[in-house]
Amino acid sequence: GMRNPYRFSFDRGGTNQLWAGDVGQDAIEEVDTITLGGNYGWRVYEGTQCTGNDPGLCTPANYIMPIYQYPQTGSRCSVTGGNIYRGPQNTFPSGTYVYADYCTGEIFTNAANVTALLDTPRNISSFGEDESGELFITGLGGTLDKIVRARSSADFDGDFKTDVSVFRPSTG
């Protein structure tokens, strides 16, 4: 099973795969690709970590393990499932899964090691995309922000850590 799936999305421009963020209990936040009838291991596993609730069932081959996971360290506490980026503005490479931590406002991608790509000053409650595939984030306070590629080119190693920012449209 899953513990607490929070935000689902389909890869609408590629495989049509269903993705979900699954909020952990005490240790790990995870992102899963959803398979019909799939068993994602909750109560036996939190992420790829055996919980000890039923050690006799801790056999990874019996479960679908997460695609990405990160620990609940510091203020990280709740994954917000995101979207696969397919936009024409090349904010991210096409096919990149973009998601967040609700408590910290950090935005992550499907990089091999999960490190924050961008820190925002808000609790990200959801992602959305426009008709062209560009991504937006929302917060419970009513904010709607578009994620855009920064105008300067300071990302020398291609990891997107310095050339992505949040753009807030002006009101009026």
Descriptions of predicted regions:
Residues 1-112, 145-147:
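Beta-propeller domain segments
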Residues 2-7, 79, 124, 132, ...:
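Conserved positions at the start
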Residues 11-13, 85-87, 130-132, 157, ...:
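Structural WD40 beta-propeller signal
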Residues 14, 103, 131-132, 140-141, ...:
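Short loop/turn segments that connect beta-strands within the blades of beta-propeller domains
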Residues 20-21, 99, 136-138, 166:
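Residue position within the beta-strands of beta-propeller blades
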Residues 113-131:
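Conserved blade-ending motifs and adjacent loop-strand segments that build the rim/top face
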Residues 125-150:
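Blade-level signature of beta-propeller repeat domains, shared across WD40, Kelch, NHL, RCC1
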Residues 150-172:
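Trp/Gly-enriched beta-strand/coil motifs that build multi-repeat beta-propeller-like domains
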